[in-house]
Amino acid sequence: MYSEADRTLWHGRIHDNDNHAHFTNSQLVQVVDAEGELTERFDVGILGYAVDRGVYLNQGRVGTKQGPDAIRTKFGNLPLMHDLSIADFGNVTTEEKFVEDVQHEYAELIDKTNDYAKFHLLIGGGHDISYAHFKGLKALYPEQSIGVINIDAHFDLRDSEYGTSGTGFKQILDEDADAGYLVLGLQEAGNTQHLFEVAEQYDVKYVLAEDIDYDTTDEIIQSFIEQYDIIMLTLCLDVIDSAFAPGVSAPCSFGLTPQQVERLIRAVLSYGKTRHLSIAEMNPEYDIDGRTAKLVGHIMFFAVHRNPSIL
């Protein structure tokens, strides 16, 4: 079910009402009804996946359906470093038992809003957003190959009769034989032996969290990206150490730092093959003083302000 964004979420400190050099994001965001006729084009589009049913079905900690709105409040208070236009295209939600219908709806909105923003921030919500993200890209680029880069502690290659937050990438690989899959920041202790066997079966590439460095990891990213026309980039916040990101569905004790994650995102975006970044598993129910939501706001800030697709 679609709902237009709540304009009151976009608030923050007002330094000046006229000089854009003093503006925060909240002062320039335009709330747009994505179900209506779209005419104006923006630099950045935001689309929320306010769904945690997939997390529940994956036996995780629910609460991520509140994630998109919590993220908006923190991103809105950050400075606007370039004269950019930002559209908030609203949220999808669901009260249904399963997530397939809301994933389909979200994919359709990705398709519809694509031409009306240079770069899209897809904010969740459970990591079942990944399958919806991919379906949206396939609708946009049916004849082009898609490589999926997932910055995540987990493979999310589980098998189930219905979609969950842990099945998205297996669904993608089962449906598209031409798709490739690279996981960055994987936790060896966060995946069963069976999941490693499934990853080998599907020829999944991965870099363990302990092996993330700049030179070697950049080479792996480059080698992967060069094989595909389009790169789908998705971030699961449980890849970040729980000292920095307590407000997630599955907190991680040996996770990456925010700086490492930002550096990985920047490396992927530098190739110009990525126009959508999905961010999953922000769970305000377990956040501390808005720490995780603010971290996501900063990740979005850098994804926008260090992005060759926009600037």
From Swiss-Prot:
Highest taxon listed in the record's lineage: Bacteria
Pathway(s) annotated for this protein in UniProt: Amino-acid degradation; L-histidine degradation into L-glutamate; L-glutamate from N-formimidoyl-L-glutamate (hydrolase route): step 1/1
Keywords assigned by UniProt, alphabetized: Histidine metabolism, Hydrolase, Manganese, Metal-binding
GO biological-process terms attached to the record: L-histidine catabolic process to glutamate and formamide; L-histidine catabolic process to glutamate and formate; putrescine biosynthetic process from arginine, via agmatine
UniProt: Mn(2+) 2 binding residues: D152, H154, C236, D238
Function according to Swiss-Prot or TrEMBL: Catalyzes the conversion of N-formimidoyl-L-glutamate to L-glutamate and formamide.
Family affiliation: Belongs to the arginase family.
The protein's name in its UniProt record: Formimidoylglutamase
Source organism (scientific name): Macrococcus caseolyticus (strain JCSC5402)
